[in-house]
Amino acid sequence: MKSLLAIYPGSIVSEELCIREGCLCFFDESNQRYISIPKTEISEKEVLVLQSFLTPADEGNQLSMKSPEENKWFSFLFSRGELPAYIKKRTRFVHFHLFGKIERTSFTEAVRHFWPVSFVIVWIHEDRGVIVEQESEAAAEKDELESLAKVLESDFYFSVRFYAGRFYEPDECLRKHYAREQAYFLFAEKRLPQVQSVTFEMIFPFLLLETEKEKLETLLSEEAELLFGSESELRKTIKLFIENNSNVTLTAKKLHLHRNSLQYRIDKFIERSGIDIKSYKGALLAYFICLQNESSE
């Protein structure tokens, strides 16, 4: 983006779709940013070059092809529109990227037959989008997304990658959660290109290795706020449980709690956070979040 700003000094870079009269707008997937360039500063040949690595973005065209529900979500995510009023339950985003001869109708129908609950597909680009789903007991798991990916590949001859996000409270912060998960998904595609369905737990070890210290601390602090908020006792409980190799009996004894009481707390944490701390990858993620939260007190 810096190099483009140097070439086109009248340009504006923003996190939201920015449509200005007399300007062309493009979206940079790698940085998750929009750039609006004055038409007076760019030639037709340069437009073609930019279109080879940036996605043309036009709010009118984007919205005219979408359903009312999809329009509401697109507006909320990219133009600071209001959160759709019907959203009352915790909500998650399942990000996807299609490859091959893409047929949106076929993809939508396949997802509709597979998905056990109601959802909205929001197309962000020609080959990318997000499935918006409210929380229910029938929510698709990682393995089920992998099964769907295999069906699409065998029956429709195009492949897909998924990033299964976590469930969040239905408020304005959903916009921020979407952007953060989209960045995780782009990172996952570079680091785990052959994996059809990924989660935050799966990419976290790679983030540990490749993310700058300050950015990693910020990332972990944000996750800690989501998981624990001001519940320091819950954080201590989860940390001790992991340190005791997920042994409920031993952890309960050290905390002077009844085993069933501790088991209930752990199960509720897993349900609320979407992180299975009984698994190795889930425990690793939660433990580092606990350590960061502890050190920042």
Swiss-Prot record:
Residues 128-156 form a coiled coil. GO terms for molecular function: DNA-binding transcription factor activity. Disulfide bonds: none annotated. GO terms for biological process: positive regulation of DNA-templated transcription. It comes from the Bacteria. Pfam families: HTH_30. Keywords: Coiled coil. The keyword Coiled coil applies. InterPro entries: CdaR-like_regulators, PucR_C-HTH_dom, PucR_C-HTH_sf. This is Uncharacterized protein YxkF. It comes from Bacillus subtilis (strain 168). The lineage of its organism: Bacteria, Bacillati, Bacillota, Bacilli, Bacillales.
